[in-house]
Amino acid sequence: MAKEKYDRSKPHVNIGTIGHVDHGKTTLTAAITTVLARRLPSSVNQPKDYASIDAAPEERERGITINTAHVEYETEKRHYAHIDAPGHADYVKNMITGAAQMDGAILVVASTDGPMPQTREHILLSRQVGVKHLIVFMNKVDLVDDEELLELVEMEIRDLLSEYDFPGDDLPVIQGSALKALEGDSKYEDIIMDLMNTVDEYIPEPERDTDKPLLLPVEDVFSITGRGTVASGRIDRGIVKVNDEIEIVGIKEEIQKAVVTGVEMFRKQLDEGLAGDNVGVLLRGIQRDEIERGQVIAKPGSINPHTKFKGEVYILTKEEGGRHTPFFNNYRPQFYFRTTDVTGSIELPAGTEMVMPGDNVTIEVELIHPIAVEQGTTFSIREGGRTVGSGMVTEIEA
């Protein structure tokens, strides 16, 4: 049989499994791929067993080693990319670095245990890094005889979610057994199909990158005699068109306005550049020395320059090439945003004396000059050009 063409007509959604160690995240991932392959066979829906998912390859993302398994599958309505990380540290790194941007996640909780410390931590991380939609899968229900006990566990999970500002009373909770489904028990297979229908319905279709407001981090600037100033870089999101009014944001206190008079890619003139394109944009009314690497070109009003923010950060271990020693309050490294380094100072949370390599922590940062940042912007922490940490902006303060 000929391979089916990749069907782009289906909306694409990124999800993942989160939850405490040994609660069944990887078994559930295997069960989803296997049950979909049995019930909705297609070239995309191929069963993956536990061992192949668990043996996730090491990836390096911004200098950090992360083990992550990527699987894909489809329902009748959607195409999914699903991430599953074997170790707790891999989840923390994945979420904080933005390596795995999830539109929603399935929180797996073993009914035999109820919520555990990493359940709480993954919920908090989801809240911090902007994973807005969680669905709960209460796993291993076949091992619990007592209906009341299941109700108590469900209440406990809902309360915990509400504590972190998720709609704990309303979000879907599905009770099943990933292992039984994997083994082919049709009752539990049906529950996996219910779970996927719920994911289809409950996790909204993500906004496409091209529908978001323009953001183009400036990498290089040059002037063309008689035509003006060109800024080049890779469009992070949105679309840039000839005659667009744009703003140049960051480094300087004030925002500058300009008009795009040309867009080119590979030396060819274009009408527009899209998210993901490497383009040069010709700007009217901007001198060569008025724009620099580290600034961004953005849709007017969509992003502002800031110097103070809260962030969730992961500090690399010595083995990852990070620091060998802890750091303390008022530590002053460089913060690398998109294309440039800016010095800033770190304030640790009350009661935290120091941060050890391998820790993740919420910090307050004050930069020496403003950068275009917003909730969800990722950054690296660097010392003398080497990466010692990775983080994400969770709250703007000034």
Curated annotation (Swiss-Prot):
Residues 177-179 are annotated as: G5. Residues 63-67 are annotated as: G2. One of its GO terms (cellular component) is cytosol. It comes from the Bacteria. One of its GO terms (molecular function) is GTPase activity. Residues 19-26 are annotated as: G1. The keyword Metal-binding applies. Residues 84-87 are annotated as: G3. It is found in: Cytoplasm. SUPFAM superfamilies: EF-Tu/eEF-1alpha/eIF2-gamma C-terminal domain, P-loop containing nucleoside triphosphate hydrolases, Translation proteins. InterPro entries: EF-Tu_GTP-bd (IPR041709), EF-Tu_GTPase (IPR050055), EFTu-like_2 (IPR004161), EFTU_2 (IPR033720), G_TR_CS (IPR031157), P-loop_NTPase (IPR027417), Small_GTP-bd (IPR005225), T_Tr_GTP-bd_dom (IPR000795). Residues 139-142 are annotated as: G4. Keywords: Cytoplasm, Elongation factor, GTP-binding, Hydrolase, Magnesium, Metal-binding, Nucleotide-binding, Protein biosynthesis. GTP binds at residues 19-26, 84-88, 139-142. It catalyses: GTP + H2O = GDP + phosphate + H(+). Residues 10-207 form the tr-type G domain. Its EC number is 3.6.5.3. Mg(2+) binds at T26. Monomer. GTP hydrolase that promotes the GTP-dependent binding of aminoacyl-tRNA to the A-site of ribosomes during protein biosynthesis. Belongs to the TRAFAC class translation factor GTPase superfamily. Classic translation factor GTPase family. EF-Tu/EF-1A subfamily. This is Elongation factor Tu. The lineage of its organism: Bacteria, Bacillati, Bacillota, Bacilli, Lactobacillales. The gene is tuf.
